[in-house]
């Protein structure tokens, strides 16, 4: 909202879920098992698919998308049982955020959905308010969720994306030389960071 409103000019790590309140169509990026491989996803998001996604779904909301990159596959952790097939999620108290795509996915899997802020996940797992959650592996490790979770299922069910966005009016107000320099710097940075992302 700050970037969109202009009080902040740009931001990094704006995941698709952040846009849902403005345009729910952006949730297409959160479709489970959308791509068959990381290479396939990078080709799509770095090509026409990603360009059209940005142009048709994000930029009309007042943003200029400078890049789209993945921030890791989502995996499921829980305290109840190993997750080996979809039916294993039945009845597990599964934490998700308010994103309608994720809620629909866990509802379809018969999980018992608990909407909870990520900041409350560790405590929720510790005290049994929730049994399970999903995140990228680095997020799970960084939040020490291994201390309060017994099982990890490497499901790769969602490849989470982030964008570097700038307020569209700010970008359009830049001299074309500065626009080109900014575009080039972001593209070069993405090439350098991409091997470290997943």
Residue ranges and their predicted role:
Residues 1-40, 48-198:
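N-terminal secretory/targeting leader peptides
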